[in-house]
């Protein structure tokens, strides 16, 4: 609903959940009232008068995004027509059945009550079937809504325990983390399914549906003059500014980590951070991994706890020669670390 209203109003209005729920409920009830006036079904088939309202509700919740500024229905155009045709036939049968004798029992256990309950259950299933049930899209819309409210902590809690993600969701989480100044500390606690070319909307490979891109660019320092790769955009920002924007620095460093470019990461991190134990966690993990992988590293990083933890990871991997089994065991203990992302998350 939020996405549909934003697109249809071209960003001029925002969907208010409480007001929208009340308004939609009243509108659907009014439709049912009108339908009942023209098709006065009673007793066993009364619930059929709710089908047009429920069908409209399903259509309203079935929209899917197309790019950054348009939507479309997530089902074929003929589906509602076919459903209405079946409904019309059922109403004919229901009108004829009203003249037939029925169970005189009135109340919870009457036959008409249970038949109507069954019909309403089927209508609810119809709405659920028609509606957009894409979990990742719902996460994206909730995060963008939280960003519009300036609630970055709330945005970062959305879908945190889920393994489902996409490039747009990763981009939104990176931005929320950047606003908190914790990208280097928490990014790989989430499933990262993008690469550096998708971590910003500068090249249109990832899109924002509701949150204005201008707000993101203002935070980073400038709007790109043309389409360009995010890393190129960040490098231009760094060259322009005499004082390095910490968010720009973290975006570049995390871009290298996402692409598994440890050499570039190791060469760049010294420009932004003092190499010591106070580095953000994922940067310490990356430098530890880099030091162990390279025979002649440009940066040698050792930290007792981190070295012990990495050695334990290597010992754990040696116990399981089969990749699938090894991945499962490592995931149990190391999911949320850069080490797990680098070696196992594709």
What are these language model-derived features?
Residues 1-52:
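Membrane-anchoring hydrophobic segments
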Residues 11-28, 73-87, 112-113:
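Alpha-helical transmembrane segments of polytopic membrane proteins
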Residues 47-104:
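Membrane-embedded alpha-helical segments of integral membrane proteins
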Residues 109-134:
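Internal/C-terminal transmembrane anchor helices
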């Amino acid at each position: 609903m939020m996405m549909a209203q934003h697109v249809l109003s071209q960003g001029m209005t925002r969907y208010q959940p409480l007001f929208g729920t009340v308004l939609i409920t009243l509108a659907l009830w009014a439709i049912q009232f009108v339908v009942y006036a023209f098709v006065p079904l009673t007793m066993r088939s009364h619930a059929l008068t709710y089908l047009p309202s429920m069908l409209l509700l399903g259509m309203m919740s079935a929209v899917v995004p197309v790019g950054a500024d348009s939507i479309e229905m997530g089902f074929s155009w003929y589906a509602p027509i076919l459903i209405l045709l079946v409904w019309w036939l059922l109403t004919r049968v229901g009108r004829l059945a009203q003249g037939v004798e029925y169970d005189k029992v009135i109340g919870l256990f009457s036959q008409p009550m249970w038949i109507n309950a069954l019909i309403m259950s089927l209508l609810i299933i119809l709405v659920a079937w028609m509606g957009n049930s894409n979990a990742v899209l719902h996460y994206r819309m909730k995060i963008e809504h939280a960003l519009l409210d300036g609630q970055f902590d709330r945005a970062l809690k959305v879908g945190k325990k889920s393994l489902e993600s996409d490039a747009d969701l990763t981009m939104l989480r990176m931005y929320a983390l950047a606003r908190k100044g914790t990208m280097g500390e928490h990014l790989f606690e989430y499933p990262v399914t993008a690469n550096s070319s998708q971590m910003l909307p500068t090249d249109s490979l990832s899109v924002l549906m509701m949150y204005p891109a201008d707000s993101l660019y203002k935070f980073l320092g400038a709007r790109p003059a043309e389409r360009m790769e995010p890393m190129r955009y960040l490098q231009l920002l760094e060259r322009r500014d005499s004082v390095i924007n910490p968010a720009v620095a973290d975006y570049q460093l995390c871009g290298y980590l996402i692409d598994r470019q440890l050499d570039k990461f190791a060469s760049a991190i010294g420009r932004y951070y003092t190499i010591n134990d106070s580095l953000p966690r994922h940067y310490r993990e990356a430098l530890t991994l880099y030091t162990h992988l390279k025979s002649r590293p440009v940066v040698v990083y050792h930290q007792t706890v981190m070295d012990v933890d990495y050695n334990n990871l290597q010992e754990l991997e040696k116990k399981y020669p089969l990749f699938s089994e090894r991945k499962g065991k490592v995931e149990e203990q190391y999911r949320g670390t850069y080490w797990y992302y680098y070696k196992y998350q594709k």
